[in-house]
Amino acid sequence: MAEKLPPEVQAQLAKFQQLKDQLDRLLLEKSTIENELREINKVLEELSVLNADATIYKIVGNLLVKSDKTSVEKELNDRKELLELRSRTYQKQESILRKQLEDLQAKINEMLSKYYPQGGQTGIKA
């Protein structure tokens, strides 16, 4: 029969799982932002080779709307700036979460070593 983990360890493991889930969600959002940034950069690159008076269409909902190059570039650059700010914010949050996870993992390992000083004989792996 497997030994039950002490409540303190269980609480720390639950906190660890919450932080891990939070990091996973953050990484997914960050990936989405990075993909959108790549797409915006590609579009801006394509726009740069067009004449200023070129006919441009953009998607608005379910419609294609005629627009001018300057306003589309401004819109894309504004969106790019916002996404870059979000990306930097997510990068900082990711660093903080990774540090918290690392610290919590060390704390859990320390707690486990106090409860199970023989190590591998209990069947618990950190």
Swiss-Prot record:
The protein, known as: Prefoldin subunit beta
Keyword Cytoplasm: yes
Family assignment from sequence similarity: Belongs to the prefoldin subunit beta family.
Record's keyword annotation contains Cytoplasm: yes
Cellular location(s): Cytoplasm
Pfam families linked to this entry: Prefoldin_2
Subunit structure: Heterohexamer of two alpha and four beta subunits.
Upper taxonomic lineage: Archaea, Thermoproteota, Thermoprotei, Sulfolobales, Sulfolobaceae
SUPFAM superfamilies: Prefoldin
An annotated GO BP: chaperone-mediated protein complex assembly
Organism: Saccharolobus islandicus (strain L.S.2.15 / Lassen #1) (Sulfolobus islandicus)
GO terms of molecular function: protein-folding chaperone binding; unfolded protein binding
GO cellular component, one term: prefoldin complex
Keywords, comma-separated and alphabetical: Chaperone, Cytoplasm
Main localization, broad class: cytoplasm
Biological role stated in the UniProt entry: Molecular chaperone capable of stabilizing a range of proteins. Seems to fulfill an ATP-independent, HSP70-like function in archaeal de novo protein folding.
